[in-house]
């Protein structure tokens, strides 16, 4: 039995050392140390030995089992390390190689138009003023010379949240808040108010229930309609170019008097009449006028000393005119096939 154990040990250790992968090593563990392996058979034969031989052979058998177990464990660590190193070698990334650059977005067409207009007005000395989109009824209507019985207060025209709060229908409330807190000792008011507004309109080619608006306000001493006309002329030439036909026509707004609307010839039909311009050949681009004395007085401004003008236009309409977009809904559908036509070189490609 002694010779049998020694032969078994030598044979097993040789095969363990020659094992080239973990599967082969595991097969050897089962072969030599498993329930049906030679070590188990030798242990079963211990009962046939004499009382004097049994302790010696039992101790030797345990030493062989321990030696084989340790040999397998040691070889397993070596093979596992080799497997990990081989995997790392095959999956190594060369960090010096150029990577795959992620796609970079660009500014949305509306954002481009709004920023272009903001830059233009800032260049004319205007400041940007902002206000809440959930507005008090007072600032949205009453402070702008729209009394409580005015049709614009009807529930079908506005999104009311409570009896006294609503989603603002225009950015004019920002003008009212600006006038209310302005100190004329620091100079006249000269602001633009960009932002989202909400009206219960039926969505079509030129209308949306949510859209953006930029309103302008100038209030100071000796501000006249000529100043308003000059501002609108600069706006038209800057945003639309000399080739665009423009007309100014009298209109009515509760918060301005006198009032005027500026129309631009339809980009789709060239003034002949189509569904975009509703057959008129013209698309309204903005409304404006001299600030109504009542609006000044509501903000505690002396209307006998100070005067001003205000105007408001939608960047969506400007975008449609400048870039020949025939349906306002294209600006909100997030279709990359449409958006990619107006990539901003300032921020990269989509």
Curated annotation (Swiss-Prot):
Keyword Secreted in annotation: no
Keywords attached to this entry: Aminoacyl-tRNA synthetase, ATP-binding, Cytoplasm, Ligase, Magnesium, Metal-binding, Nucleotide-binding, Protein biosynthesis
Assigned EC number: 6.1.1.20
Enzyme class: ligase
CDD domains from the UniProt entry: PheRS_alpha_core (cd00496)
GO molecular function: ATP binding; catalytic activity, acting on a protein; magnesium ion binding; phenylalanine-tRNA ligase activity; transferase activity; tRNA binding
Catalytic activity: tRNA(Phe) + L-phenylalanine + ATP = L-phenylalanyl-tRNA(Phe) + AMP + diphosphate + H(+)
Annotated cofactor note: Binds 2 magnesium ions per tetramer.
Entry cofactors: Mg(2+)
Pfam families attached to this UniProt entry: Phe_tRNA-synt_N, tRNA-synt_2d
Gene Ontology biological-process annotations: phenylalanyl-tRNA aminoacylation
InterPro entries xref list: aa-tRNA-synth_II (IPR006195), aa-tRNA-synth_II/BPL/LPL (IPR045864), Phe-tRNA-synth_IIc_asu (IPR004529), Phe-tRNA_ligase_II_N (IPR004188), Phe_tRNA_ligase_alpha1_bac (IPR022911), Phenylalanyl-tRNA_Synthase (IPR002319), tRNA-bd_arm (IPR010978)
Cellular location(s): Cytoplasm
GO cellular component, one term: cytoplasm
Amino acids binding Mg(2+): 257
Superkingdom: Bacteria
Family statement: Belongs to the class-II aminoacyl-tRNA synthetase family. Phe-tRNA synthetase alpha subunit type 1 subfamily.
PANTHER family: PHENYLALANINE--TRNA LIGASE, MITOCHONDRIAL (PTHR11538:SF41), PHENYLALANYL-TRNA SYNTHETASE (PTHR11538)
Complexes and interactors: Tetramer of two alpha and two beta subunits.
Name of this chain's protein: Phenylalanine--tRNA ligase alpha subunit
Organism: Listeria monocytogenes serotype 4b (strain CLIP80459)
Taxonomic lineage from the root: Bacteria, Bacillati, Bacillota, Bacilli, Bacillales
